[in-house]
Swiss-Prot record:
Name used for this protein in its record: Tyrosine--tRNA ligase
InterPro entries on file: aa-tRNA-synth_I_CS, aa-tRNA-synth_Ic, Rossmann-like_a/b/a_fold, S4_RNA-bd, S4_RNA-bd_sf, SYY-like_C, Tyr-tRNA-ligase, Tyr-tRNA-ligase_bac-type
Subunit annotation: Homodimer.
Gene name, Swiss-Prot/TrEMBL: tyrS
UniProt lineage: Bacteria, Bacillati, Bacillota, Bacilli, Lactobacillales
Pfam families xref list: SYY_C-terminal, tRNA-synt_1b
A GO molecular-function descriptor: RNA binding
Domain S4 RNA-binding: 352-418
Binding site for L-tyrosine: Y34, Y169, Q173
Residues that, per the record, bind ATP: K232
Length: 418
């Protein structure tokens, strides 16, 4: 099976400009290719991982990746399939975000070894050197307005209003391909299927300006089996930055993937062989309640993104919380595992009587209910049941001098911080 056949078998090929010519290029020699990442935030997220890992698979097959950080295009904003104009970021912000994204990409691509080691480029380096007049003369003249308006990615915005700034975005992305081809012999661009219009602007410019053929391959935008856009947890993006989405939260995200999606996601997001995945699928279908596919997904992706130690910690947090063994975890581990539960910062004037604190922290709705909860054995401090109405919280209840975990019943948690 050649690399293109494997990408197809994994569900990673959505559209190509000329499949036969691309397969020929990929099987006859080394291809230099690129994927672009605009710094629209200070971190990449799971949605980016499809293109990143596809790029990694091609590198493992001997091809040479260029990771393009859009320091210039990030200042403009991509209008593709967006309902409204993006807010423009300052140059300083985009520069800072670009640096963070560079660091994240180095965890997935090999920038050190071999003749196909990855190269990092920033389109600000060439766009900052081009005058507006030169850009219009040397690039703009190759694009008709009719061609630009025909792109599905901007049609909707043409009706509701689009600035010239965003309208010109596709020409900038097209010029990226031309520049990389001219300087580094890059002949293939990879990106999400929503980028098709911008990406083919590059092949158009290559054809008209340099009389060369470029290839485009898009990866699918991933949705779950209900059609919901993938990569969100409770409406929030699942970030690759551990400070924005902890390894534990990422682990839980994968653990909660629906059965109908789990095997498909193993093909897309892991480097397990297709034979290994087929074996996992057989075992998974025989005992879905054991969630083998989800557990494998969680292990593989968290290890890939954050490392083996982070995976082991996420697994340990999961197991200890499930067993109610709060005291077996550090304050930092508890902050990861209980990041979504109510948090109350204890004030110096607060009563440390347990009944009072249950009401103050919003754990019980009233003192009467709080007393009943304590007497009925429904209240746990750091995993230990407390039934003393006169119990006073003390330093002994602080884990690492930072927090106390109170549980009401089986599932209602609150964290007291000091």
């Amino acid at each position: 099976m050649n690399i293109f056949e494997e990408l197809k078998a994994r569900g990673l090929v959505f559209q190509t400009t000329d499949e036969q010519a691309l397969v020929k290029a990929l099987t006859e020699g080394q291809v230099s290719y690129y994927t672009g990442y605009d710094p629209t935030a200070d971190s990449l997220h799971l949605g980016h991982l499809v293109a990143i890992l596809t790029s990694r698979r091609l590198q493992l097959a001997g091809h040479k990746p260029y990771a393009l950080v859009g320091g210039a295009t990030g200042l403009i904003g991509d209008p593709s399939f967006k309902d409204a104009e993006r807010s423009l970021q300052t140059k300083e912000t985009v520069l800072e975000w670009s640096d963070k994204i560079k660091g994240q990409l180095s965890a997935f691509l090999d920038f050190e070894n071999g003749d196909n080691k990855a190269e990092l480029v920033n389109n600000y380096d060439w766009f900052s050197q081009i005058s507006f007049i030169d850009f219009l003369r040397d690039v703009g003249k190759y694009f008709t307005v009719n061609y630009m308006m025909s792109k599905d990615s901007v049609k909707k915005r043409i009706e509701t209003g689009i600035s010239y700034t965003e309208f010109a975005y596709q020409i900038m992305q097209g010029y990226d391909f031309y520049e990389l081809n001219d300087k580094h012999n890059v002949t293939l661009q990879i990106g999400g299927s929503d980028q098709w219009g911008n990406m083919t602007a590059g092949t158009e410019l290559l054809r008209k300006k340099a009389d060369k053929t470029g290839h485009v391959m898009t990866v699918p935008l991933i949705t779950d089996s209900t059609g919901k856009k993938f990569g969100k947890s409770e409406g929030n993006a699942v970030w690759l930055d551990a400070d924005k989405t902890s390894p534990y939260e990422m682990y839980q995200f994968w653990l909660n993937v629906m059965d109908d999606d789990a095997v498909r996601f193993l093909k897309i997001f892991t480097f397990l062989s297709l034979d290994e995945i087929a074996e996992i699928e057989t075992q998974f279908n025989a005992a879905r309640h054991e969630r083998l596919a989800q557990k494998t997904l969680a292990r593989e992706v968290v290890t890939l993104v954050h490392g083996e130690e982070a995976y082991k910690q996420a697994l340990n947090i999961t197991e200890q919380l499930f067993a109610g063994n709060i005291k077996n975890l550090s304050a930092n581990e508890l902050k990861q595992g209980l990041s979504n539960v109510p948090n109350y910062h204890v004030q110096s004037e607060d009563s440390l009587n347990l009944v009072d604190m249950l009401v103050t922290a919003g754990i019980s709705p009233s003192k009467r209910q709080a007393r009943e909860d304590v007497q009925n054995g429904a209240i746990y401090i750091n995993g230990d049941r407390v039934q003393d109405l006169d119990y006073q919280l003390s330093n002994d209840d602080k884990i690492d001098d930072q927090l106390t975990v109170i549980r009401r019943g089986k599932k209602k948690y609150a964290v007291l911080t000091y």
